[in-house]
């Protein structure tokens, strides 16, 4: 244990230097431009430059980088604990709790490819961390990556598998043309107002709600074999960041992968019995199409922070890589343009943090 703590402290010290030092050259090489007025104090931008900076940058309303954290590989999600620390998912490292100095306080190492942590974390009201990981089994004579939700307590180190797709879904039926070695491609988690957990599945264009006791799926919104139908002209495709704003009111980023005409959007639905209706949407000026990644987050004042995270030409995306704060009426209050990255996985509103 002493050696483990010493190693963590040493690594934390190394990261602290990187986080508090002048902006490194590869982060400076990314051009960040902002116009307008941002409501939260900062936006946390998840950056991935294939041959450059990889990690998280805290950007103020003027586009200035106020704080940063470098990851080993893809920055796969972020949230904050009650003490104000960030919890980051680093594809090349695992889960890390990081304080404002950039020091690692707690960590959970990445696993082998068949059980790899990926794409999504969320801090629970209990101050634990839910995260997605592959859960691989044999199916039809081949290895198939399903999904599992784990719960990690950074303070005690306890790490428990809470839910797995193999127990509640059928890979022979709950699949699409995108299903190959990976079955569902989970890409976001959210704790709903009733303690339920929302999980978004890219490959079957569906959001599910898991009961608080983990013993059942409460509903399946849109996509393959839904229990809640969405009108054909309001369907989503490859959606991200599904969140239940209040009971039966769902906000998400709809990539609209493979749909025509090609544009992406933020969209909000109200669930009423066995159906859902669209009550709000927003598309970027110019019809930005982001074939993957991206996010939509509702702010406390009712505005929405929306990120289109794919560079122009990447998997058919139109670009640019940009984010907006928009009002309920659709007016743009703030715009962020990011140039020099392959992807901007998400943009999160951040208050109450002092670098």
Say what each PLM segment does:
Residues 21-355:
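Histidine-/acidic-rich catalytic cores in large beta-rich domains
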Residues 6-16:
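Bacterial N-terminal signal peptides
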Residues 1-4:
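Positively charged n-region of N-terminal signal peptides that target proteins for export
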């Amino acid at each position: 244990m002493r050696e483990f703590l010493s190693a963590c402290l040493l690594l934390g010290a190394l990261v602290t230097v990187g986080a508090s030092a002048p902006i490194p050259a590869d982060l400076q090489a990314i051009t960040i431009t902002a116009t307008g007025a941002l409501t939260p104090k900062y936006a946390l931008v998840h950056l991935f430059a294939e041959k450059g900076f990889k990690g998280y940058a805290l950007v103020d309303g003027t586009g200035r980088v106020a704080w940063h954290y470098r990851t080993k590989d893809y920055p796969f999600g972020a949230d904050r604990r009650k003490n104000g620390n960030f919890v980051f998912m680093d594809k090349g490292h695992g889960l890390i709790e990081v304080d404002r100095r950039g020091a690692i306080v707690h960590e959970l190492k990445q696993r082998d490819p068949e059980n790899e942590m990926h794409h999504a974390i969320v801090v629970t009201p209990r101050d634990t961390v839910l995260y997605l990981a592959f859960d691989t089994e044999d199916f039809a004579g081949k290895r198939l990556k399903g999904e599992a939700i784990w719960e990690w307590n950074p303070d005690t180190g306890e790490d428990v598998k809470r839910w797995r797709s193999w127990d509640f879904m059928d890979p022979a039926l709950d699949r699409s043309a995108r299903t190959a070695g990976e079955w569902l491609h989970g890409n976001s988690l959210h704790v709903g107002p009733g303690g339920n957990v929302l999980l978004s599945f890219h490959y079957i264009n569906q959001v599910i709600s898991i009961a608080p006791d983990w013993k059942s799926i409460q509903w399946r919104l849109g996509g393959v074999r839904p229990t809640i139908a969405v009108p054909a002209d309001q369907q989503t495709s490859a959606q991200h960041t599904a969140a239940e704003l209040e009971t039966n009111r769902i906000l998400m980023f709809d990539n609209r992968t493979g749909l025509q005409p090609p544009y992406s959007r933020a969209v909000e639905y109200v669930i009423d019995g066995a159906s859902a209706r669209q009550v709000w949407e927003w598309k970027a000026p110019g019809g930005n199409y982001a074939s993957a990644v991206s996010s939509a987050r509702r702010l406390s004042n009712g505005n929405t922070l929306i990120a289109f995270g794919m560079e122009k030409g990447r998997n058919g995306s139109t670009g640019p890589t940009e984010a907006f704060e928009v009002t309920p009426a659709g007016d743009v209050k703030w715009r962020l343009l990011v140039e020099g990255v392959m992807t901007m996985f998400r943009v999160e509103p951040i208050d109450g943090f002092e670098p």
